[in-house]
A protein has these predicted regions:
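Predominantly flavin-linked oxidoreductase catalytic cores and closely associated redox partners
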Residues: 1-142
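FAD/FMN-dependent oxidoreductases across multiple families
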Residues: 113-199
Length: 199
């Protein structure tokens, strides 16, 4: 409604669905639909501001593994590794529960697009680290991948924008609407962690 968001409209099953459109009105609409939430996009579009800047988005890929060696306490510290083959990103191991670890890799999307060969694919880089890197191949020698645990996604960083127009970081609220979580770009650009910031 011009300078104010008054609700949402959409279809169950997405825009191409045969279902009829539904509309919901509210004095405050919460944008909680992830990094590409339509409400967040509308907030920036209304103000003629960029919604996305690849300098402030990270590509992430993770898998769950069982029986990775050298983890110590199942609720122990996370591991973040800056490996030459992964730069300008990092490789992580985060304990999830006893015997299970979240293993992943992340890289700025703007940098990932500049890579060549294996480094173009986070999944391929991760496979190489697990199978070939001298520091990790022995740790994963007897480990098993948890079936259907592979997932890739994009993380919107809450970092200051350098290019004009400069919004610190991205507009996340306006009359009638407010963004939360990934829709509000709350991911820490150093650690890739966003839950604490979102809370």
């Amino acid at each position: 409604d011009g300078a104010k968001i008054v609700g949402v409209k959409g279809k169950i099953g997405g825009a191409r669905s045969e279902e009829p459109s539904l509309s919901f009105s509210s004095p405050l609409t919460i944008s909680a639909g992830g990094y590409n939430c339509p409400v967040s996009r509308t907030i920036t579009e209304i103000h003629n501001e960029p919604h996305r800047d690849d300098e402030h988005f990270c590509g992430g890929y993770r898998e769950y593994w069982e029986n990775v060696e050298g983890l110590g306490d199942p609720e122990g510290p996370i591991e973040i590794h800056f490996i030459d083959e992964v730069l300008p990103g990092y490789f992580w191991l985060f304990p999830v529960k006893e015997g299970v670890v979240n293993v992943g890799i992340g890289m700025l999307i703007s940098e990932q697009r500049k890579q060549k060969g294996m480094k173009k694919s986070l999944k391929q880089i991760q496979r190489w680290v697990i199978e070939e890197h001298p520091r990790f191949k022995t740790r994963f020698a007897n480990a098993t991948l948890v079936p259907a645990s592979q997932k890739g996604w994009q993380l919107p960083f809450g970092s200051p924008r350098k290019n004009a127009p400069s919004y610190q970081p991205r507009r996340v609220a306006m009359a009638g609407a407010m963004a939360v979580g990934d829709a509000a770009s709350l991911v820490d650009p150093f650690s890739g962690e966003g839950i604490g910031n979102a809370l």
